[in-house]
Amino acid sequence: MKTKLLNITILSIFCSSLAAEVLMKPTSYSSELYKEKILDGNYVTSIDHPNTFLDFNYGDRVANHTQISNAILRWAKQSNKLKVIEYAKSHEGRPLYVAFISSSENINNLDEIKNNITKLSDPRTTSNAEAKSIIENIPAVAWMAYSIHGNETSGADAALGIIYHLISSNDLEITMMLEDMVVVIDPMMNPDGRDRFAKSLEQYRGTAPNYDDQSLIHTGDWPYGRTNHYYFDLNRDWFYLTQPETQGRVKLINQWRPQILVDGHEMGAQDTFMTGPPREPINKNIDYDLIKWGNIFAQDQAEAFDKKNWRFYTGEWHEDLYPGYSFYVQFRGSLGILYEQSRMAE
């Protein structure tokens, strides 16, 4: 009898170990829902693939703060097209990084580019002739900001792939773009919330994919990962500046005055995609030229979505009134664009 119980115990432990191993394997959402290859380009071999830093294939599961940080810091040593700056630390001590990506020449001249942008922003100290010369000779600055809500996970994961694609691709289109543009990527604006939600994914992950959007693996549990350590919504803090993440971020953005800032979010699982232009009310302090260019970008985005046959909508609940969103930048002359996509978490 004792021998039988011992055998049953050993067998149970063995089966539990197998189940634990399966639980750690990535879910198969990406391969089932997205048939196109995510990273598809002509890449140099001297820069490590994102899989090097992950316990799974890129895109199969949510990457945590440590994995993303390790990747971009390593890439900064491997590529002359990338410069990484730490601009803040979260309440829990996690560093927040921003990645400057451009041609090697532009990266070497970042300080000069920033100084020229500062001159361009102040007509009191810059003549028309000097302003025209600056406009013709400096690259544009495009700021990409992701996952300010920690449980809206795809933004930070997308940022990881975008950084790799831009610094390692030999494609002519990418090379030409980086000669004319400095792409600034803030991959993870809320590391504390993201890691809190990533931990809940580990806790609720099953042995098989779960497509029920009411499941805890997709919704998480309180206090969720949307907010930072003190449960503050960082996408309400852009002009109040009460949180260290926001203070460092806004200071850096104000120094660079990008022409455009894209804010990547997720929304309900039953949704599709949403982008600009926003609905009314529009804050009367936003310059008309920004509204005009927002509509131009919106039309271009709509055409791109139509080519892919992706369903999307504009406006609806997205307004441009409150200055505490990322659209704070529009009160300083930058065009703000919101991207929203439906979420499944993992």
What function would you assign to each model-found segment?
Residues I8-S17:
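Bacterial N-terminal signal peptides
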Residues L5-N7, A20-E346:
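M14 metallocarboxypeptidase catalytic domain recognition
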Residues M1-K2:
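N-terminal secretory signal peptides that target proteins for export/translocation
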